[in-house]
Amino acid sequence: KSLTKGMAIHGIFGSTGSALGPLLATTLAALISWRSAYAFLGIFNAILAVGTYLTIPYRKRSEIPEEEFANHNINTNKPALIFYFLANGFMGMAYYGFTTFMPLHFAENTTSILPNLTENMKAGLFPTMVFIAGIGGQIIGARIGERFHKPTALMYIIMANIPFLILMGYTSDIFLIISGIFLGIAYFSNQPIGNTLIANFTNSQNRGIGYGFSFFISFGIGSFAAGFSGLIAENMGVAAVFPAMGILLIPSVLFAFLMSRAARSS
């Protein structure tokens, strides 16, 4: 339980950064130039990298006794882990798909909301609201992970994303914003559970590899969805991207179901 809470706290700070990023970038672009937004974020990350290196203590693996590893496991549940990676890959593709075009979609389809704001400001403001909602999703995900069978809970969380992605493609103005907020809650609630599952499925000594491979699949392979979504947006319109990402989650639900079965049988 404490591990799931820890993952939620970690995710909350990540969602906070994701929420502030678009708003900060669009504000700097509007007040100065788009180059200033990139420059500021680059300098900030350089400072953050130095601070991380100086403040986080380093311990060699050989110095850490086995019993000190959280969720100490001696075996890896390979079938469950593989199915999780596959489910996470499709989740990553959906994430890259909808986040790539979410700013443009909000800018073009919220004409009656805050009409005095420019499209550029709306492209930063409304995605920020979605990511702020993700903070609530992290908390909800942690509570769900504490109370229910985590692999099964993840399957239902993935399913919950599908209707909100579809709604985002067919709504505008206030209903679009509401759909986006619920999507933020639904999507980010998967993170504390998913990260805990990696810890549950992996050998304690190989856990870092498990997390690294998971991020590679989600953010590396998942990034290909940006190009795929671009083809959809060019040929069918930006709004069509969101239902397409919802359809993309159907295989993710299937792999999450298989993961749940593999986890129960171990």
Predicted features and spans:
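C-terminal transmembrane helical hairpin of 12-TM major facilitator-type secondary transporters
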Residues: 148-197
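Symmetry-related core transmembrane helices of the 12-TM Major Facilitator Superfamily/SLC fold
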Residues: 37-54, 242-257
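Extracytoplasmic gate region of multi-pass secondary transporters
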Residues: 79-135
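Small-residue (Gly/Pro/Ala) motifs that create kinks and tight helix-helix packing interfaces
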Residues: 17-29, 103, 225-233
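Cytoplasmic helix-loop-helix junction between adjacent transmembrane helices
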Residues: 1-16
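A late C-terminal transmembrane helix in Major Facilitator Superfamily
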Residues: 199-236
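Helix-to-loop junctions at the C-terminal end of transmembrane segments
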Residues: 137-149, 233
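Flexible cytoplasmic inter-helical loops of multi-pass small-molecule transporters
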Residues: 56-73
